[in-house]
Structures are given as structure tokens and as C-alpha cells.
């Protein structure tokens, strides 16, 4: 489809940051790649007078209006003013709230800035995921002090799966591998020791997991990595490390569901740091 030379203007009116509305608009605009669109975000609009000024400007520029406003009264006023001006408009929040009102059998609470809280939680989760990926398997110890949780364990003790799972819950997680006869990084002992958790696993389970992984990648499962004698040495080394560092709680991940272990880790960390129970999932 051919484009045109016109620049289209979309006004976003929000009682908070407008970030959620902007994200939704951009997602929709992917379907209109040939159009030149200018998005103007008007934040913290919470009165009829403020809304009227935005609508007047939108009218003068022949734009479209999209809005996210919690107040039912203000939404109605915006709808009335936009309709009166003949402005194309769309309420991004109202239809959802109306459906939820019916579903829950009660009216919404008109909480201003509720979407901002959603935005903040979203960006916190993204930040946590990025941090966790960067600090997976000892890739870097820079900013280790920024971690909410640090997992320490030998290979195949679920360090990475646990880290990623927790990061999607908003926790910045670093994981540090225990390598036989290799000293732990100095940075590990310079951070808050209450945030560190040890992971251990039974020998039989570990051997089975390692052999399966080697076979999956077409490698010889009979090497030292999956041998019982080598595994015994690794576990003995890990137990020695954990015995010296008694402040680190140790979790045995053998045959445990990932979610169960993650929840227990968060519960322990929250208790140690004095965090509210609401952080536990």
C-alpha cells in the first residue's frame, strides 16, 4: 500500500505518564508503516480545564485523541468535548474498566495514576531480567552489589532457570558457579551476605541430569563431567564452601519444582532483609 506525504498527529491524554497508552499506540502503528505519525503525549491531565486545552489543540491540528483516564467523570467530559469538536477519539481504559465492573459486580475505584504503577512494575521487571542475563553463570561480577539475590552452586543445580524465573518476578539475580578447586570471586564477599543462597543436589540426580545434557548435545556421557567420582568431589567441595560460609542458607534442589524452590528462596531473603510478606509469591 502506497504512503502519502501527510503527517498524522495523535494526542495521548493521560492522568499519569501516558506510557502505557503510548506503548499501545506504537504497537498498533506497526500495522501502518507507510504513515508518518507524530505522537504528542500530554501527562497528568486531571481536570476538565486541562483536558479542554488538550482537546482544543488536537482539534486545531486535526489530530486523533487517545486517552487513559481513571475518573469516570473526566472520561465522560473528554468524550463529550471530543465528540463536539468532531475529533476521532478512543478511550483506551474505559471499555476495559466497564467490562471489569460487570465481571466483578462492582464499580472501579477511579484511582489516578494506577497505570503508572503498572508501568513502573513492568520496567522494574525488564531491568531485573536484563541484569540477570548479564550476570548469569559468573559472566561478570561488576555491580554484584546491585543483586537482590545471589545464587551459588555447582553446574546443573538449576542456577540459571531459578535466576530467570525470579527475574520475571522483578528480582535482580546473579548466579556464581562453584568450580572444583577454584576460589570464589572476591566480589562475592564484599556484598551483603544475607542475599546469598547456596544450591546443592543429590549425586544420583546430578549424574542423571548431566548425562542427559551431554547426550542431548551429542557428547560422550562417559567423561569426567558426568562421572560419579567427579560429581562426588564437586559436591564435597560445595559442602565445604557452604560450611565455611554458614550465613548462606542452602537449598537442596533435588526433585523439587522450580517454583517451589524460588518461592522458598524469596521467603528466606525477605525474612532476612525485613521485606513485607507481599513480595512472596
UniProtKB/Swiss-Prot annotation:
- What EC number(s) would the UniProt record show? 2.7.11.32, 2.7.4.27
The top EC class, named as a word, is: transferase
Q: Which cysteines are joined by disulfide bonds?
A: none
User: Where is ADP bound in this sequence?
Assistant: 153-160
Q: Keyword Kinase on this protein?
A: yes
Cited InterPro entries: Kinase-pyrophosphorylase (IPR005177), PPDK_reg (IPR026565)
Q: Name one Pfam family in it.
A: Kinase-PPPase
| Keyword presence, DNA-binding | no
Q: Which reactions is this enzyme annotated as catalysing?
A: N(tele)-phospho-L-histidyl/L-threonyl-[pyruvate, phosphate dikinase] + ADP = N(tele)-phospho-L-histidyl/O-phospho-L-threonyl-[pyruvate, phosphate dikinase] + AMP + H(+); N(tele)-phospho-L-histidyl/O-phospho-L-threonyl-[pyruvate, phosphate dikinase] + phosphate + H(+) = N(tele)-phospho-L-histidyl/L-threonyl-[pyruvate, phosphate dikinase] + diphosphate
Q: Name one GO molecular function term.
A: ATP binding
What UniProt keywords are attached to this protein's entry?
Kinase, Nucleotide-binding, Serine/threonine-protein kinase, Transferase
- So what family is this one in? Belongs to the pyruvate, phosphate/water dikinase regulatory protein family. PDRP subfamily.
Free-text function comment from the UniProt entry: Bifunctional serine/threonine kinase and phosphorylase involved in the regulation of the pyruvate, phosphate dikinase (PPDK) by catalyzing its phosphorylation/dephosphorylation.
Its recorded name reads Putative pyruvate, phosphate dikinase regulatory protein
Amino acid at each position: 500500500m502506497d504512503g502519502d506525504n501527510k503527517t498524522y498527529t495523535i494526542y495521548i491524554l493521560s492522568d499519569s505518564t501516558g506510557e502505557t497508552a503510548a506503548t499501545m499506540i506504537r504497537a498498533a502503528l506497526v500495522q501502518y508503516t507507510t504513515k508518518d505519525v507524530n505522537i504528542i503525549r500530554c501527562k497528568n491531565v486531571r481536570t476538565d480545564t486541562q483536558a479542554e486545552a488538550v482537546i482544543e489543540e488536537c482539534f486545531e491540528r486535526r489530530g486523533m485523541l487517545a486517552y487513559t483516564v481513571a475518573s469516570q467523570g473526566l472520561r465522560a467530559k473528554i468524550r463529550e468535548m471530543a465528540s463536539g469538536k468532531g475529533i476521532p477519539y478512543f478511550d483506551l481504559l474505559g471499555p476495559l474498566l466497564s467490562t471489569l465492573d460487570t465481571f466483578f459486580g462492582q464499580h472501579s475505584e477511579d484511582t489516578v495514576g494506577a497505570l503508572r504503577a503498572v508501568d513502573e512494575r513492568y520496567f522494574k521487571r525488564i531491568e531485573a531480567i536484563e541484569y540477570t542475563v548479564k550476570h548469569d553463570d559468573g559472566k561478570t561480577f561488576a555491580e554484584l552489589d546491585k543483586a537482590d539475590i545471589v545464587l551459588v552452586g555447582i553446574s546443573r543445580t538449576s542456577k540459571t532457570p531459578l535466576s530467570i524465573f525470579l527475574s520475571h518476578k522483578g528480582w535482580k539475580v546473579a548466579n556464581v558457579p562453584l568450580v572444583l578447586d577454584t576460589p570464589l570471586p572476591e566480589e562475592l564477599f564484599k556484598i551483603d551476605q544475607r542475599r546469598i543462597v547456596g544450591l546443592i543436589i543429590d549425586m544420583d540426580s546430578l549424574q542423571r541430569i548431566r548425562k542427559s545434557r551431554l547426550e542431548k548435545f551429542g557428547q560422550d556421557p562417559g567423561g569426567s563431567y558426568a562421572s560419579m567420582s567427579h560429581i562426588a568431589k564437586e559436591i564435597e567441595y560445595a559442602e565445604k564452601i557452604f560450611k565455611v560460609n554458614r550465613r548462606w542458607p542452602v537449598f537442596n534442589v533435588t526433585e523439587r519444582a522450580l517454583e517451589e524452590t524460588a518461592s522458598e528462596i524469596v521467603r528466606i531473603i525477605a525474612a532476612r532483609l525485613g521485606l513485607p510478606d507481599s513480595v512472596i509469591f
